[in-house]
């Protein structure tokens, strides 16, 4: 159960996942169900709510898929990784239960121009290869990657922003002696009509594991 205090929701989540070899790569599948409950002091839906009104006793299907494929071209090792995340709602949802697109964690290339909806998906694709950078005798393994993401959301309520986003990323990451950093540039490629298009963004993330 998940209690969301700002909306007073109680949610039952049932999730399943499967990972298996498929061809030369690894395929992952997931399927889940979320149900808003009346338990634990949750908000109760009143009778006769219009279709556009969000429900506390909602229902939605969650799904996902991923594929990891290593391959070799021109004497160099490459990997292709694709992941799909989505949901299909049976009712209008509160914001905490909607799916959102437009961030470094969903469709890259967007910061201010994100979209949220009752139903939707996002697909992230990365192509990467590795090389070694060795200044002053220190060896740093570098992962170079290019990404192309897309996603779309829909809302049951009329007049709420919805549509599709497409974005791209180009970057490099290093892991060395517990430290990790990632430098990337993300750019928006497509937005819904009427939505302001953002410029490219450069991101730097640094971490350390003890």
Question: Where do the protein language model's features map onto the residues?
Answer:
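Outer-membrane beta-barrel translocator/channel fold
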Residues: 1, 187-202
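C-terminal outer-membrane beta-barrel translocator/porin domains of Gram-negative envelope proteins
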Residues: 1-150, 154, 204-206
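A generic structural micro-feature
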Residues: 6, 138-140, 162-164, 196-198
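Short basic/hydrophobic patches in alpha-helices and adjacent helix-turn junctions
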Residues: 127-130, 171-175
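C-terminal beta-signal and adjacent terminal beta-strands/loops
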Residues: 148-159, 178, 184-193, 210
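A short alpha/beta connector and helix-capping loop motif
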Residues: 159-172
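Outer-membrane beta-barrel "beta-signal"
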Residues: 172-176, 198-210
């Amino acid at each position: 159960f998940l209690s969301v205090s700002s909306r007073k929701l109680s949610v039952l989540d049932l999730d399943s996942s499967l990972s298996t070899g498929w061809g030369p790569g690894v395929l992952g599948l997931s399927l889940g169900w979320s149900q808003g409950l009346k338990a634990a002091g949750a908000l109760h839906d009143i009778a006769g709510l219009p279709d556009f009104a969000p429900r506390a006793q909602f229902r939605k299907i969650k799904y996902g898929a991923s594929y990891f494929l290593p391959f070799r071209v021109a004497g160099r090792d490459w990997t292709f990784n694709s992941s799909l995340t989505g949901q299909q709602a049976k009712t209008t949802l509160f914001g905490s239960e909607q799916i959102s697109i437009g961030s470094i964690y969903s469709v890259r290339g967007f910061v201010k121009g994100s979209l949220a909806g009752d139903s939707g998906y996002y697909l992230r694709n990365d192509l990467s290869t590795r090389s070694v950078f060795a200044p002053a005798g220190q060896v740093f393994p570098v992962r170079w990657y290019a990404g192309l993401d897309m996603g779309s959301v829909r809302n049951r309520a009329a007049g709420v922003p919805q549509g599709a986003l497409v974005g791209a990323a180009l970057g490099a990451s290093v892991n060395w002696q517990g430290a990790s950093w990632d430098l990337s540039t993300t750019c928006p490629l497509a937005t819904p009509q009427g939505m302001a298009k953002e410029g490219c963004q450069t991101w730097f993330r640094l971490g350390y594991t003890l």
